[in-house]
Amino acid sequence: MTNPSDAKLKSTGLPRNGDKLNSDFFETYLPRLLEERDRCGLTGMIGGIEALMITVEPGNSIEYIAELALMTPYHYLVTLDSPRHLTHILRIDMNSPDILLREVKDPDYHDIFRNLNDLHPSGAQRPHSRYLGEILWVSNREQVLELQQAREFRFFSPDALAELDLPTNVSISKPSPYTQNVVGYMERHPNTVRVYHPLGNCSILPQAQDTYEKAKELQKKLDIGDLIGPIDHLATRGYSQNREAALLEYLALSSYYYWGSYNIPDQNSSTNVCKSVRPVPESVSPAKVFTANNLPYCVNHLDGLPSPTETFVSNFGPRLHHIALTVKDGERGGKENIDFVVDAIASQGKGFLLEVVGSRDAGLKQIFSAASPISALIIEYVQRFGNFQGFFTKDNVARLTAAAGVEESLVKIKR
């Protein structure tokens, strides 16, 4: 994960991408924040993403294991049984982040994460279901925690983590006021496996194992298992006024750098990207994408501009919107691999929000699935061609954003 050269990592002076203009505040504080992070040693001590944490409603985790086993490279590993949650560990390998899939046992259970859901109409429809955040690798958890607390970042106490059935060998921040996600820190020797403790009795649940095996058999039958790669990026949506603060906050808590922002005027939004400062592929530590409106919803009636991002946030609250996975470059069955994968999954009844957008000439093709009825998360597939290094084209992201906005509008009408 790290080596002695990490102490010399530099987070500033890296190439900037995009055409979005930021405020003077952002451009002033960005280099100051990154330089201070490098200078105090946090950049060197904080590594990539070790795990993602997702919670679902009582009785729904087995079905979500099936969904993820079919649509992603993840494998069911074990289940940890704690007083208020079942936590299923899903893993590709030790070179990609785990997924901690948590199922609440009691539908009447309340905690801080349910309270965040209850504030928003769509979030309240699934009161327990939400993406919690990421766990990051650190070389010295105690020192990182001390430095971050000195910088006024707040963390759950070990007793609070135990009460929440979250691993106490991980230091976890309080939910962000800008994204409502958390960031955790876990210390682990690079040559050891990830362990989350003490989360109760560890076992392989027969129902989970059976469901997982059937989904993987179907994935193999559809001939798509070797085409779907690890996570490429994680995309969060927030309010327009919080865009720059959300970026600076994540940069302060991680060892990522600001890759750049693109203005998407057709959708009244921007797409903003942060990447690991280490020269590692996104499969090892996914990029973080933040999307926000250019103008807040309170002036939409004046200009009549589209507002799919702000509408999503108004309905669900600031949160993760989609998980993007890479698709291996190439062709199968006379189709580009991404088209082959999408057609195969669609044949099993899984919906997609639009046709695959982009082209080989443009450098990449992308598509959004329909939102999961269990987690509300969208799966994005991305196939890059040749040496294309970006995460989207402006035309692609405009069409994807519009399609997601149409789906959210239809869901709202049905309620």
Task: Give a label for each model feature.
Residues 1, 21, 28, 34-111:
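Hydrophobic, helix-prone linear segments
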Residues 68-69, 131-134, 181-183, 250:
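Extended low-polarity, hydrophobic cluster-rich segments
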Residues 38, 80-81, 105-126, 176-177, ...:
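ER-lumen resident redox/N-glycosylation machinery signature
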Residues 50, 55, 64, 226-265:
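Conserved small-residue-rich
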Residues 59-75, 148-150, 241-258, 340-348:
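Amphipathic alpha-helical segments
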Residues 2-45, 47-59, 79, 90-92, 99, 113-154, 171-175, 230-241, ...:
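Vicinal oxygen chelate
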Residues 256-315, 320-322:
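Long, well-ordered mid-to-C-terminal structural blocks that present hydrophobic/aromatic surfaces
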